Amino acid sequence: MKKWFLVCLMFVTLLALADGHGDLGLEKRQPDAPMNVTSVVLGEDVTSVSAEGDMEGYGKVYVTYHLSYNAARTGGTVDGQGRGFTPDGYASGRFQGFWELVDGVVVMRNVVNITDNTMNLDVIKFNPLTRELVVQAYILK
């Protein structure tokens, strides 16, 4: 099952690497969501980035990204989870994907499985110089 998921994840990631997400015909789930980076923990094998912000449909969101490095240390895999809280309750999501360094910006592309039985392709851009982090969420399911 895990291998099947990784194969599907790689397929979706290859699509995400194409220029222009509009070309894929994916619809945005919500407006782009700027987040406040609350911590960056550097490690030899993994760096963790935590952020919080408001997202349409999910409320106040807290998320942590765990980035593992490739041999060149310019990309690798990413996994993590997030929680969103609204007056009506909460949602939880787990994600896996890949990241790369593009012109000094960390670009993550993740498949997100959310407890409300929805699935997103999230494209996250994190600029370590300015601490800007923006989440673009596209509907997969």
Give the role of each language-model region.
Residues 18-141:
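Beta-strand-enriched cores of mature, soluble protein domains
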Residues 1-4:
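Positively charged n-region of N-terminal signal peptides that target proteins for export
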Residues 10-17:
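Hydrophobic h-region of N-terminal signal peptides that target proteins for export
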